[in-house]
Regions:
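Acidic/polar-rich alpha-helix caps and helix-coil junctions
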Residues: 1-171, 190-360
Length: 360
């Protein structure tokens, strides 16, 4: 037990490799002791220990291959990198194959619905709200944090952070950036689309100009996960007040709480002044009543099967190059966004840029 900083301030730092091995041994111990499958929500099982051990090895391999600029005393070791990439891939493959896990709703994209309507949303949205996501269909959530919900004093605050005033007077503490929008690919070609252009809402052409960030048509035929994740101009979301549904509201950039008529019906627009680039989140915001902004019972994902698919592909690619097994895993993740599978000419480029694409 340490009682004062003076007891440790002059201790020399342990070598990073020694620290890494200690963490590895903890994950291995957990793997040996945990059950194959937990019967209690929020408790870890063997797949979680393997997934975290593999992730640590993937980091270690990457530092040893590509260096660690922030740590000038770290010396990369190519042989250590190759060994760690192989070990990471092995751990990830066991998670994928040995425990009967599957993607949420079998990785199917579901229906996109229609522009400016939220009655129907892609399957991806439903993985991140408690009423449907907490059931953990297929076991995709390998490790997650539970929350108590109403009356527990341990509810989740995610609606407060992600939602606006239209959802239980939430605070919209974070909003999507335009650079995220530009990562969502075309469902027709599988390629990136021309980057959207920010425009002032007062410009008379702002909502009709080609590739304008405020033109809803700029978002037609994009990765289904975009609609599941965010709102752009004229997209609808359920308004919530006093734990009750109060009807759909349209998001219109810089028109906060105004009156608009859409298809002959009057609406009050989404209320927030926090949006910077013209978007707000849909992901993690409940579309039903029953709980306040800090009273959610969301199972917050820490590591998911889709994450493991992509980490396996990265690790195996570093050792063996693009392989059919890894490409199939990547395409299973892409399918949930209704994206076409990778073709041979795009495979190498995909693996190079995987980490900056919201593929999972």
């Amino acid at each position: 037990i340490v009682y004062d900083n003076s007891e440790v301030v002059n201790l020399s730092r342990m070598p990073i490799a020694q620290i890494k091995e200690k963490i590895m041994s903890d994950f291995t111990y957990a793997f040996n002791k945990l059950p194959d499958r937990s019967e209690i929500s929020g408790r870890a099982a063997k797949p979680a220990a393997l997934a975290f051990r593999g992730k640590l090895q993937l980091y270690w391999a990457s530092w040893n291959k590509y260096g660690w600029p922030e740590l000038s005393t770290f010396t990369p070791d190519p042989e250590e990198a190759k060994k760690a990439f192989s070990a990471a891939a092995e751990d990830f493959k066991h998670v994928i194959e040995d425990y009967g896990l599957n993607l949420f709703r079998n990785g199917e994209p579901g229906d996109w619905g229609t522009m400016g309507n939220a009655e129907v949303l892609p399957n991806y949205y439903y993985m991140f709200i408690p009423s449907t996501g907490n059931a953990n269909d297929g076991g995709e959530m390998i490790f997650y944090f539970t929350h108590g919900g109403v009356g527990s004093a341990q509810g989740d605050p995610y609606m407060r952070d992600f939602g606006g005033r239209s959802q239980e007077n939430s605070q919209c503490c974070l909003t999507p950036a335009m650079r995220l929008v530009n990562r969502y690919q075309s469902t027709k070609t599988g390629d990136f689309l021309p980057e959207v252009v920010g425009m002032n809402p007062s410009d008379p052409n702002a909502r009709t100009a080609e590739n304008s960030a405020l033109n809803p048509e700029s978002y037609a035929n994009r990765d289904y996960r975009m609609k599941a994740t965010m709102l752009w101009d004229y997209e609808m979301i359920m308004s919530l007040s006093s734990q009750k549904e109060t009807g759909y509201v349209p998001f219109i950039f810089k028109n906060w709480g105004g009156k608009v008529e859409i298809d002959g019906k009057e609406y009050t627009t989404y209320r927030t002044d926090r949006s910077v680039d013209g978007y707000v989140f849909r992901k993690f915001i409940r579309n039903y009543g029953g709980a306040g902004r800090d009273e959610g019972d969301m199972n917050w994902p820490v590591i998911r099967l889709a994450d493991v698919f992509l980490m396996y592909a990265e690790a195996d690619n570093e050792v063996n190059g693009p392989q059919p097994y890894a490409i199939d895993l990547v395409n299973r993740v892409r399918h949930r966004g209704n994206l076409p599978p990778l073709t041979a000419d795009k495979t190498a480029k995909f693996f190079l840029h995987k980490l900056i694409h919201p593929s999972f």
